[in-house]
């Protein structure tokens, strides 16, 4: 295990890491992420067979998989903002729109879609944080992070499992708090590969993906055209 403590700048040092082109592509995204752009504190770098990990003294971390197929980022400073200043939970339509804006903007290099692919919003949830007094009694509970998860479809067929999702977390004020993406080479299940897409089969597939991820039938999904 190789360890070193990096001073500024962090990004160029990570970008020089050998390996598939995806690693450099993902590393370039660091410049767009709020806490990395601030370059506050120092970052400890760890290189091993599983990839690269940067952990900052300012409470943010980034990991990039060794094949460049997984990207994980979280800014704990934003996620742990003052509980008393938190806004209400983001509405689903706001969360989907915010996720689309980020994926089509700052994170566009991360999620590269082929012409026959689309992203589908499949579920949302909230990370809830509580405040307790010295006796341990719960004083208040608030939503710290709003999370929206997108899956990939190929020819309108949902691709389940690894290599097919992007999970974004936003503060109640709409700030990007976390990114968890697994975007490796995908495989369409053999049973689905040769199925002709019709309204009926699409309804069945939509039901299957809702069941797989626990998405209520009442939740409206959003497709990126």
Regions from the language model: what does each represent?
Residues 2-149, 154-157, 163, 169, ...:
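Preferential activation on post-signal-peptide N-terminal prodomains/segments
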Residues 201-225:
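Compositionally biased, intrinsically disordered linkers/stalks adjacent to structured regions
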Residues 168, 175-176:
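Helix-loop elements that line ligand-binding/catalytic pockets
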């Amino acid at each position: 295990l190789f360890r070193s403590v990096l001073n500024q700048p962090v990004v160029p040092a990570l970008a020089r890491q050998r390996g598939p082109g995806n690693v450099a592509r993902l590393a370039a995204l660091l410049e767009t992420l709020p806490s990395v752009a601030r370059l506050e504190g120092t970052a400890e770098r760890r290189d091993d067979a599983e990839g690269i990990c940067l952990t900052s003294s300012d409470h943010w971390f980034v990991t990039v998989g060794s094949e460049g197929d997984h990207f994980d980022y979280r800014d704990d400073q934003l996620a742990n903002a003052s509980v008393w200043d938190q806004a209400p939970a983001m509405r689903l339509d706001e969360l989907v729109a915010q996720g689309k804006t980020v994926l089509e903007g700052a994170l566009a290099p991360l999620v590269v879609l082929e012409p026959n692919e689309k992203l589908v919003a499949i579920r949302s949830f909230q990370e809830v944080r509580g405040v307790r007094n010295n006796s341990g009694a719960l004083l208040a509970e608030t939503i710290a992070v709003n999370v929206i998860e997108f899956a990939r479809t190929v020819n309108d067929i949902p691709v389940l499992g690894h290599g097919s999702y992007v999970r974004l977390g936003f503060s109640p004020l709409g700030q990007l708090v976390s990114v968890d993406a697994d975007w490796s080479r995908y495989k369409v299940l053999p049973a689905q590969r040769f199925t002709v897409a019709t309204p009926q089969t699409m309804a069945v597939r939509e039901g299957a993906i809702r069941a797989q991820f626990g998405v209520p039938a009442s939740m409206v999904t959003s497709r990126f055209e």
